[in-house]
């Protein structure tokens, strides 16, 4: 819902400013690029407006929806929360993605253990994730490595934000423990309980 509102406001802003907002299959590459550039400009403007209006829940919903690359909404919003010491908003923004990636990894680990009786951790560590993702083959071990990398990237980014915002030491320690358990694949579902914060 928030994504729809956001998109409508971007479209309105583009129209009000005489910028292209609709394309066709017959558009030239130049026309398509101009439209996409205009959309990005409009997105940044509406993001700025919504931040000024403190429409944080809606922006977090947009970020969680996955319709935009992280550098469009997620990262600028996280940086705003850090700069303004909005710890609860930062938690709500960041924890969900980490939890989902870790849950996906746990689910795939369970499937692998059910199918093969054990987990080959060394093989998982040696998987080149970008090559696996670019390929067309599927394997539980490759998926575990993919989710592990995604979760670790998210945790490391979050830990950086937490250090900047001077988060409570005990919470930062929980994040570090989670990072270790994801890294060595010893994570359990109960380890994610502290990461279910809601506004």
Which positions does each model-derived feature cover?
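N-terminal alpha-helical interaction modules that lie
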Residues: 2-67
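Conserved small-residue packing positions in alpha-helical repeats and bundles
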Residues: 47, 78, 135, 142, ...
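Non-Sec secretion/translocation targeting segments of pathogen effectors
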Residues: 197-199
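Generic helix N-cap/helix-start motif at coil->alpha-helix transitions
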Residues: 29-40, 66-75, 101, 128-136
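Alpha-helical solenoid scaffolds that mediate protein-protein interactions
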Residues: 66, 97, 104, 151, ...
């Amino acid at each position: 819902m928030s994504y729809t509102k956001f998109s409508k406001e971007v479209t309105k802003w583009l129209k009000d400013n005489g910028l292209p907002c609709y394309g066709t299959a017959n558009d030239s590459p130049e026309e398509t690029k101009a439209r996409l550039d205009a959309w990005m400009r409009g997105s940044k403007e509406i993001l700025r407006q919504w931040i000024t209006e403190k429409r944080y829940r809606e922006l977090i919903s947009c970020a969680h929806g996955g319709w935009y690359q992280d550098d469009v909404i997620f990262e600028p919003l996280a940086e705003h929360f850090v700069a303004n010491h909005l710890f609860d908003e930062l938690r709500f923004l960041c924890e969900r993605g980490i939890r989902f990636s870790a849950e996906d990894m746990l689910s795939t680990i369970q499937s692998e253990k059910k199918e093969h009786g054990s987990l080959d951790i060394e093989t998982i560590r040696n998987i080149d994730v970008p090559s696996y993702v670019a390929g067309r083959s599927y394997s539980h071990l490759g998926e575990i490595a993919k989710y592990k990398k995604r979760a670790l990237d998210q945790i490391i980014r979050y830990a950086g934000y937490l250090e900047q915002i001077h988060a409570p030491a005990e919470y930062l320690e929980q994040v570090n423990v989670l990072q270790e358990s994801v890294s060595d694949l010893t994570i359990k579902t109960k380890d994610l309980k502290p990461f279910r914060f809601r506004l």
